[in-house]
Amino acid sequence: MFEKKNRTCLTVYLHYNRDARKLSQYGDIVYHSKRLRYVLVYMDQELVEATILKLKKERFVKKVVPSYIKELDQNFVGNLWRDEEPSVVG
């Protein structure tokens, strides 16, 4: 029925807040910080590299930072989806 797509987030820093509307053509705007002038844009994983290059060429964009959450080690105590490791105690 529905297929889960890999999506990622880009943090786009702007010179002016009025330019945040222009980012809606690149993906889904999730959050806009008016005080710190950045926008979180979610998009499909396969479009990220091309979109970063396009956004860096735009005059209203200061900086583009991709999300690194996929690269972090999420195997820690308290994580519900971690791989079960054999217990040392018993």
UniProtKB/Swiss-Prot annotation:
The keyword Protein biosynthesis does not apply. It comes from the Bacteria. Signal peptide: none annotated. It is found in: Cytoplasm. Keywords: Cytoplasm. GO terms for cellular component: cytoplasm. Pfam families: DUF2129. HAMAP family: UPF0298. Belongs to the UPF0298 family. This is UPF0298 protein SSU98_1559. The lineage of its organism: Bacteria, Bacillati, Bacillota, Bacilli, Lactobacillales.
